[in-house]
């Protein structure tokens, strides 16, 4: 059970869904200095990544998560949400084909992607001379390994490129998305993307079909830093979506995106989704006591339930297992 309240923290026994057997990764917001928060986290056996603007990511032993949550220096803690791949747009539907004859082809612009990776050997992502258009690949699946343009060019000259740059795109989703946006180079022009002469940067998420919101935040920070280093205007594409959260901009991921968009030279593009009629959410007014029944399959080890309310009303929630034995009682 996960109860979201703006007062402090959003944690529950379901944090195992975003962890391994010993550690959990969470996003936080704090009004203290990065050095102070880093020291607090290190004292609890964890690692802190500063994202700027008070945001950060903490990797911490599971048994110390409650201690982190009770620190007066931490304003809010949030478990990462899962975001899934989306790519249902086309150039024709977006009226891009009508401007292909113009000179607006993305020259001098860095387009960053947070996705499943990229097939860097594909001719659509090379210049006319065969060199790569990819400035960086940031592979979170390899523990955050960064491959540079020089390394990618070296790999392209090799008979065994993956021995030099081993990052791949297993599902092909990221490659497909980059193709829609940036395909160009040595392919038929009818398959060109929106910005066929732009530079490319890829953040590969550490899951094959979905990403955690903490990975998205790491990726945004990386791409913004690289855009500054290259002194190039930056657009970030995330063809990922989720039905987790309140859908009102209150999650730390949403707040971080809003803050970055308002303060940095960046345009952030996200997938709109195609699930408006899927009925993933339900709303209503609680009158006295409401009982809701649901089934959990025997092969489901973890179930996450998100409930949202306005700030003032008090709500008490009790979760009962078969036999009417109280499992947990929460008040928000």
Please state what every model-predicted region is:
Residues 206-286, 300-316, 322-323:
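Substrate-binding/access-modulating region of protease and related hydrolase catalytic domains
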Residues 33, 37, 61-64, 121, ...:
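Stable alpha-helical elements in mature extracytoplasmic
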Residues 100-214, 231-232, 301, 312-313:
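Subtilisin-like serine protease catalytic core
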Residues 4-56, 63-102, 110, 123, ...:
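Autoinhibitory N-terminal propeptides
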Residues 46-47, 314-331:
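Surface-exposed beta-strand/loop patches in noncatalytic accessory domains
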Residues 60, 80, 114-117, 183-184, ...:
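Active-site-proximal beta-strand/loop segments in catalytic clefts of secreted hydrolases
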Residues 286-297:
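Non-catalytic, beta-strand-enriched accessory regions in extracellular/secretory proteins
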Residues 1-5, 328-332:
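Conserved small/polar residues in nucleotide/adenosyl-binding loops
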């Amino acid at each position: 059970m996960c109860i979201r309240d703006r007062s402090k923290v959003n944690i529950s026994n379901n944090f195992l869904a975003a962890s391994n057997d010993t550690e959990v990764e969470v996003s936080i917001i704090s009004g203290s200095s990065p050095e102070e928060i880093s020291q607090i986290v290190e004292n609890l056996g964890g690692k802190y990544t500063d994202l700027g603007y008070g945001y950060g990511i903490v990797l911490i032993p599971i048994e110390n998560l409650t201690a982190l949550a009770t620190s007066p220096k931490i304003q809010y803690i949030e478990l990462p949400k899962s975001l899934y791949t989306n790519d249902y747009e086309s150039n024709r539907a977006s009226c891009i084909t009508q401007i292909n004859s113009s000179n607006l082809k993305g020259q001098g612009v860095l387009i960053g992607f947070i996705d499943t990776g990229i097939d860097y050997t594909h001719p659509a992502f090379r210049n006319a001379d065969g060199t790569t258009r990819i400035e960086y690949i940031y592979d979170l699946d390899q523990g955050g390994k960064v491959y540079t343009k020089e390394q990618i060019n070296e790999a392209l000259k090799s008979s065994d490129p993956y021995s030099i740059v081993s990052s791949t795109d297993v599902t092909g989703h990221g490659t497909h998305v980059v193709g829609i946006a940036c395909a160009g180079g040595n392919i038929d022009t009818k398959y060109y993307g929106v910005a066929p002469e732009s530079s490319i940067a890829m953040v590969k998420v550490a899951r094959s079909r979905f990403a955690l919101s903490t990975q998205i935040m790491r990726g945004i920070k990386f791409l913004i830093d690289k855009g500054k280093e290259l002194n190039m205007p930056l657009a970030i594409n995330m063809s990922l979506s989720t039905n987790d959260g309140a859908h009102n901009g209150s999650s730390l991921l949403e707040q971080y995106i809003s803050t970055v968009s308002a303060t940095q030279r960046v345009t952030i593009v996200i997938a709109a989704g195609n699930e408006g009629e899927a009925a993933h959410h339900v709303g209503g007014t609680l009158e006295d006591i409401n009982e809701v029944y649901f089934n959990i399959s025997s092969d489901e080890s973890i179930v996450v339930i998100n409930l949202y309310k306005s700030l003032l009303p008090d709500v008490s929630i009790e979760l009962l297992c078969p036999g009417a034995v109280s499992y947990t009682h929460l008040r928000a």
